[in-house]
Amino acid sequence: MKLHTKSDFTALMHRFLDPLLPLYSEGGARLHLGDTGVTYPGRTIEMEAFSRPLWALAPFWTGGGRADDFLCIYRKGLASGTDPESPEYWGDPNDYDQLFVEMAALACAILETPESVWEPLTDAEKADLAKWLDTINHHDLPGCNWLLFRVLVNLALDSVGMPCDMARAAADMAEVDKWYVADGWYSDGPADIKPQKDYYNPWAIQYYTVLYSVFAAKSDPARAALYRDRATKFGQQFARWFDENGAALPFGRSLTYRIGQSAFYSACIWAGLEPLPLPVMKGIIVRNLNWWLERPIFDRDGVLTIGYGYPQQYMAEQYNAPGSPYWGLKVFLLLALPDDHPFWTAEAAPLPVELTRAGVTGQPSADLLLQRLPDGQLNAYSPANYEKDDHGQFVEKYGKFVYNTRFGFSASRSYVQLEQAAPDSMLAFVIDGWTFVRRHSDRFVLMGDRLLSEWRPFPGIKVTTELVPTKWGHVRNHTVESTIACTAYDCGFAVPKFAAGFAAAANGTGAEAHNDICRCTVQGRGGEGFLVNAYPNTNLYDPNTVIPAVRYDVPVGTSVFTTTVESRHE
């Protein structure tokens, strides 16, 4: 899709939002998009779906856009949703309530365009909305990026002269500042809980602190300057998560937010920051959006689906409701830019040569080792140093040996069968029919050109894995100390098996699967070539895949297994 002018981006916003118009409730405060469940009740699910389009609509209205149909719905919905006497009342929030998450979009809408969403309300409606938002100051929140929702809400309340708690907001920001690591990276929570470093940097912590740097530029100039400096450093690092064709690294949780991957650069442009030249940032955004538009991410009615490269529930979080994917609309903050902003005439530029040159680059502040292959593939080697098993498929999202922008990764159906486990990019141990993989590492060392981790897939088995990048992939050196005789499968990437030109074979000590677009080869020093026919709908990119692997017999005692994994992609 052509994405160059403001009208191009506006048309894309309407492509995402117009299918929702007939689905809003009579009072405008709820939006029913589907019937799958999450950890919060139906009225919260429908409030979430109502709130998230504001991430695009508020900037659109700020930038002079007209969408009177949506404006009418949201003015009505903000009133009925916060009126305790209304049948569409969103409810009184409790501790750790999902409603606090959704308050962020409402707060930003008030901050960005009060003339659209605040000033038209009656005094009674303003009082109801402010009182409902203020509940965030009287409840506990998780110690993660959620604290910044309270900051945004208090900024919004303060901006319209309503009761707020800026002292509470300052305490929240002080807590978040403790999580800062270096190079622009934060951990998503205090260090003692081993929090992850993932997309909750660009589309959450960094995104919100950039917003703060603008909205609080006069009231808190020192912190605003600090946040802008950190965002600049982060923007130079984060660009390495994108490959030249627009794909972003599939890694971590909440990946159903899809187009939100490039939202950080929209925030930078909106805030007047240039961690990279403006044309380069535009190129990242345009290519990433078009990469998504080439995939079946909408249903037949044009509504976004839960999933990644196609509708898929296995990879979903327990908090991914039918309206959740619209969180990615943060990328449309660009629409707040004035019509004469240079962004609208700048040509989308490619990534700088220094970011795409083949080779290995460490990102120690993110606990990753990044590798560019000669054909443009991006590999990210992960130490599996997170332990939040309360998030769905956490092992698959953080524990693979390597994540690749062209092959994606697989989320298991179950571990009762190797095919259902779909353990691509893992060393999978099969014991009594059950599959066991690296859940997290006991210890890891990130070196300049390799990654070492120690892990225990099962009581009585200890594995030390060394990952060494090569020109077209990497070598895995595993030292296995086992008190159990079992079988292990060292697996490569998942290859689409119903694509044109597909073929796969296991010969001797290796295996290969390829089609007209991609190829993955796995070769062991010893062992036996093997093909894993992964369960349908496990891979994030393609619903039907085969995983080439090497099968090793694991005796009692100490064994050393060496496997080379290489990949090609057009």
Regions found by a protein language model. Give the residues of each.
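Aromatic-lined, polymer-binding surfaces characteristic
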Residues: 43-49, 54-60, 67, 71-266
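Carbohydrate-active enzyme catalytic cores, enriched for enzymes
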Residues: 85-90, 129, 244-250, 257-387
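Long, charge-rich C-terminal accessory regions
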Residues: 337-475, 484
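Amphipathic alpha-helical scaffolding segments
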Residues: 175, 349, 493-496
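Extended repeat-based interaction scaffolds and adjacent low-complexity, acidic/S/T/P-biased segments
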Residues: 414-570
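Solvent-exposed loop and beta-edge segments used for protein-protein assembly and interaction
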Residues: 47, 100, 322, 363, ...
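Functional cleft and adjacent loop/helix regions within the main domain
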Residues: 4-16, 20, 48, 67, ...
